[in-house]
Amino acid sequence: FVPSILISVSLMAGISSLVLPGDANVFVVPTLQMAFGLCSLILLYFEGIMDDLVGLRYRVKFVIQILCALLIVASGIWLNDFHGLFGLAGLSPWFGVPFSVLLVVFIINAINLIDGIDGLASGLSIVSAFFFGIMFCYEGYWGFAMLAFSLMGTLVPFFYYNVFGDAQKRRKIFMGDTGSQCVGLILSVLAIRLSMTLPDEQPKISGIIIVAFSMLLVPAFDVVRVMIHRFRRHKNVFEADNSHIH
């Protein structure tokens, strides 16, 4: 997924600069966010490869996921406003930064855990990516809109071969931990960035935080339900089982 997404983003950026040379700057993402985000994505990508090939203990995976989340918030992408949700508005960095780290790790694992049947994780992610792309276009954040649509464009052919591919003819592909975790990371970044409030800008959509995270409601609900299910049965909440909604 990561190489395909990087190629898609680069291709779209190149085409946009040729078609709209005067407005090419609107597609630029801040350098710090791009650099830290790319490092986070590559780190999670290699962690996923190692997990798919040899298997990693969940503690090791959590440490790497937390490092990836720290890179994201260090780039300046963290949830700084609840927009009136729970009676809260602007958030202090002392709360917003650690909360954002936990949120990124939560969404990464939510997408990873719901990847249990063909087309489920990729189908939900396609809908979410399309929604984020439209919302970022409406808000005028073209760089993040490009990222969302690139993710969607990468997932659409995968969805076809994952659902309709023939395994006997070697035409069926699977997401694995590598793909699902990277998709979860990108979706978490898109959701948090869409919900952020910048000093000189205000969201055009009222209750933007609810709108942003509503796309991730199904995988989030599954994670919470599964953890409660395991806890009630005195099982390790981080150990895999067959108690998911799928």
Which functions belong to the PLM regions below?
Residues 46-54, 107-114:
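Membrane-water interface regions at transmembrane-helix termini and the short interhelical loops
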Residues 53, 92-93, 230-234:
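A short, structure-level motif marking secondary-structure boundaries and short turns
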Residues 90-120, 124-133:
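Hydrophobic, well-ordered secondary-structure scaffolds
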Residues 1-2, 16, 22-29, 48, ...:
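Membrane-helix boundary/helix-loop-helix interface segments in multi-pass membrane proteins
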Residues 78, 84-87, 116, 169-171, ...:
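Glycine-rich, flexible loop/turn motifs
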Residues 5-23, 27-46, 120-246:
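Alpha-helical transmembrane segments
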Residues 75-81, 102-110, 163-169, 192, ...:
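Short, highly charged low-complexity linear segments
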